[in-house]
A protein has these predicted regions:
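Hydrophobic core
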Residues: 21-25
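Intrinsic structural disorder
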Residues: 1-5, 424, 431
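Non-catalytic all-alpha helical scaffold/repeat segments
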Residues: 26-430
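N-terminal export and membrane-targeting signals
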Residues: 1-18, 270
Length: 431
C-alpha cells in the first residue's frame, strides 16, 4: 500500500495564497460588477498580512512567471491581472483594506535580497526577484499620482516603510544618481515614486526609523565588504561614507519637506523624527542589525525587516546618540579610519600623528594586541564633537591630516548629493 504524504508547510502556504488569489480575483470582480462595496479581497489580504510566504505568493505567484537572464522577474498573466485588480480598485469604499494591502506588501518585501542557504532554507530561488517585482509595483502605486499624503493612515505609513526599508539599493540609488535597477523599473518604478513615498510617510517617527534601519544595514554591508578587501584604502572608506551621507541627507530633506508643508517646520516633532532616524541610520550603518536587542531584532528576518519597527525600541537597543547626526557621521568616519589602520605609524611629514593624539581621548580604545578597536556606535554627542575638534586642531601630521580631511570632504559631498537629489533630480510629488 502506498503511504499518503502529509503536505509540507510550504505547500500549505502556497495553497492558502492561491486560494486567496483565486477567491479575491473571482469574487472581487463579481462584486464590482454587481456594484457591491464589499468583497472578499479585504478578507484575503487580512488573512495573509502576517505571513510573508503567503504574501509573496499572493502578489507574485512562483508558478506564474519566470526569472530572465538579468535576474528580473517576468510575471505571467495571472499576476498582471491581480495587480490590475488591486491598483484599479476603489479603495475609498474599502479604506481599511489599504491597511491590509500595505501589510501584505510589507511582509512580501522581507524576501528582498535573500537566497536559499543553510540558515535560510525556506527561501525559494526566485523569491528575491519576485519580491523586487512586488516592491516595485507597490512603491510605484503608493508613490504615484493616485494617492496623496492625506490618504495615508499611520498604519499604512508604517507598513510602507517596511517595503522601502527592504529596497535599500533603490533608495541609495535615488539619493545619489536616480538610476534604478531593472528588477524594479520593470514594475514601473521611478525614482520620483520613491521620493514621493518617503515624503508621504516622512512625518511618522516609527516609519522613518524603520526605513533608516533597513538603509543602515545596507550601507553597513557595503562598507564591510569594501573594507574587508586587502587592497582597500582611505578612498574606498571615503566613497562608502559619501554614500551613507547622501542617503542620510536624502531622508532628512524629504522628511523636512513634509513637516514644512504641514506647517510644522522646525517643530520639536520634526527635530525628533529627523534626528532620531538619522542617528539610527548612523548606528546601524556602523554596527549592523546585530546591534539590536532581541526585543527589537524580533522584527527582522535575516537581514531584512518583516514588520514595522517601534522607534523607541530601536533607540533603546542602540543607545542612539542624542548629538547632531551630521557631526556624528563625520566622527564615525574618522574613528573607522583608525580601526581600519588607515593612518601612518612612521610618517616623517611632521606634526602629531592621528594614532598618537587619539589615545588622549575617552572614546579611544584598543584591543589586546594594541590596535585601535573603537566602538563607533557608542560615541556620545559630546564625544562626536570632541572627535571633530581632534581632527581640526590636534592632528598636525600632514599625511594623517590629509586622510581626515578627505573623509570630511566625502561626507560633505554626500550631504550635497542627497539634498540635491531630493530637491531637484528626484523631487517628490508634494501632495
Amino acid at each position: 500500500m502506498r503511504r499518503k504524504t502529509r503536505p509540507t508547510a510550504k505547500h500549505l502556504t502556497v495553497a492558502v495564497a492561491c486560494l486567496a488569489l483565486v477567491v479575491g480575483l473571482g469574487r472581487g470582480l463579481i462584486s464590482r460588477m454587481n456594484g457591491s462595496t464589499s468583497d472578499s479581497v479585504d478578507e484575503a489580504l487580512t488573512a495573509i498580512g502576517d505571513d510573508p510566504q503567503a504574501a509573496l505568493e499572493y502578489l507574485a505567484p512562483e508558478e506564474d512567471g519566470n526569472v530572465d537572464k538579468n535576474g528580473t522577474w517576468v510575471p505571467g498573466q495571472t499576476t498582471v491581472d491581480q495587480w490590475t485588480m488591486l491598483t484599479s480598485r476603489n479603495w475609498h469604499k474599502h479604506t481599511p483594506g489599504l491597511d491590509a494591502l500595505t501589510a501584505v506588501t510589507g511582509a512580501a518585501s522581507s524576501f528582498r535580497n535573500r537566497a536559499p542557504s543553510e540558515s535560510d532554507p525556506d527561501v525559494s530561488a526566485t523569491a528575491d526577484a519576485r519580491a523586487a517585482y512586488a516592491c516595485g509595483r507597490a512603491m510605484s502605486y503608493f508613490g504615484g499620482e493616485g494617492f496623496t499624503k492625506k490618504d495615508f493612515t499611520d498604519t499604512m505609513k508604517r507598513n510602507l516603510s517596511v517595503v522601502v526599508a527592504n529596497s535599500p539599493e533603490e533608495v541609495a540609488d535615488a539619493a545619489v544618481k536616480g538610476a534604478l535597477g531593472a528588477g524594479v523599473t520593470s514594475a514601473g518604478l521611478e525614482a520620483t515614486d520613491i521620493s514621493s513615498l518617503i515624503y508621504r510617510f516622512g512625518d511618522n517617527q516609527d516609519a522613518m526609523t524603520t526605513l533608516a534601519t533597513g538603509l543602515g544595514q545596507y550601507h553597513h554591508n557595503k562598507l564591510k565588504e569594501t573594507m574587508n578587501d586587502p587592497d582597500a584604502n582611505e578612498n574606498d572608506l571615503g566613497d562608502g561614507y559619501r554614500q551613507v551621507a547622501a542617503s542620510s541627507s536624502y531622508l532628512r530633506t524629504l522628511s523636512e519637506f513634509r513637516f514644512a508643508d504641514d506647517k510644522k517646520k522646525d517643530s520639536e516633532e520634526q527635530k525628533t523624527t529627523v534626528d532620531t532616524s538619522l542617528s539610527v541610520l548612523n548606528a546601524v550603518g556602523a554596527a549592523g542589525l546585530t546591534a539590536l536587542t532581541d526585543e527589537a531584532a524580533a522584527f527582522t528576518a535575516g537581514s531584512t525587516i518583516a514588520k514595522p519597527l517601534v522607534s523607541s525600541q530601536v533607540t533603546d537597543a542602540l543607545g542612539t546618540s542624542t548629538g547632531d547626526p551630521y557631526t556624528g557621521l563625520k566622527a564615525q568616519s574618522y574613528v573607522a579610519g583608525l580601526n581600519y589602520g588607515l593612518f601612518s605609524t612612521d610618517s616623517d611629514k611632521g606634526g602629531r600623528r592621528a594614532i598618537d593624539t587619539a589615545k588622549d581621548h575617552d572614546w579611544y580604545h584598543e584591543d589586546e594586541d594594541g590596535n585601535p578597536a573603537i566602538d563607533t556606535t557608542a560615541l556620545t554627542g559630546d564625544q562626536a564633537s570632541d572627535a571633530a575638534a581632534w581632527r581640526e586642531h590636534q592632528v598636525t601630521n600632514s599625511d594623517d591630516k590629509g586622510v581626515l580631511n578627505d573623509l570630511d570632504l566625502s561626507i560633505t559631498a554626500g550631504n550635497t548629493d542627497g539634498e540635491d537629489s531630493a530637491k531637484t533630480r528626484n523631487e517628490p510629488r508634494r501632495t
